[in-house]
Amino acid sequence: MTSPHVELKEITKSYGSTTIIAPTTITIEEGQFVSILGPSGCGKSTILSMVAGLNFPTTGSVFASGSPITGPGPDRGMVFQHHALLPWMTAKGNIEFGLKSARPHDSRTERSDIADTYLEQVGLTHAASRRPARLSGGMQQRVGIARAFAIDPEILLLDEPFGALDALTRRELQLQLLHVWESSRRTVIMVTHDVDEAIVLSDRILVMSHGPESTVIADVAVDVPHPRHDTDADSAVELRHQLLDLLEH
């Protein structure tokens, strides 16, 4: 029997005498797009950082492909709410820099070709030579997404990647993210507080309770057919009501 691609087994997180996350077990299979949905302060970003190897549970264990996670690794890429691009490098240079660290044996030509491919996938071929200061917030975040996919991680972690963007830009980037993911089928775990975003993007939605002592209170399959541009479809409306009811309790 194969191990789940990602597994958090009976993890807890405490700071001093305050328990932020009560015992929680999560399993995610390879190729799934899973959103963790919950109110502010419930610990959802803490869970994501445990999978990234940037934080560790107080008790319990976290595994990737059956191996304990003991720190960051090239098998996991992360996109934050703020892009974290290097300001002195171009859009393409930022992607190539990530590739140089993650894939040191690739030639310069190979890195250039990979960067071009992912810039094209996020619609930024025309902006390859621009530095971040000359890119809009949405364009900067597209570069961050392209950089994360370009290093070809087995697991992609998204921490509210579109939270700082306006509604129109956010929807555009959601659809571009879905397009890039569908071509790679990497395992994706995304943290969000946006119910519609979770419905548009996910195969599964894990709903967390209010803190302190948060835990996963529901594991909801998303059966809304693709494409999901219209979240006013009957199946999406029903799912939205279900998720909002869970978040209110």
Model-inferred region functions:
Residues 92-100, 112, 116, 221:
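Short helical segment in ABC ATPase nucleotide-binding domains corresponding to the A-loop/adjacent helical element
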Residues 60-72:
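Conserved ABC transporter NBD signature motif
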Residues 107-127, 179:
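Conserved ABC ATPase "signature" region
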Residues 37-39:
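The feature captures the beta-strand-to-loop junction immediately N-terminal to the Walker
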Residues 6, 21-23:
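Conserved structural motif at the start of ABC-family nucleotide-binding domains
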Residues 52:
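Helix-to-loop junction immediately C-terminal to a conserved catalytic motif
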Residues 145:
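Hydrophobic anchor residue at the start of the ABC signature
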Residues 130-133, 151:
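Conserved signature/switch motifs of ABC ATPase nucleotide-binding domains
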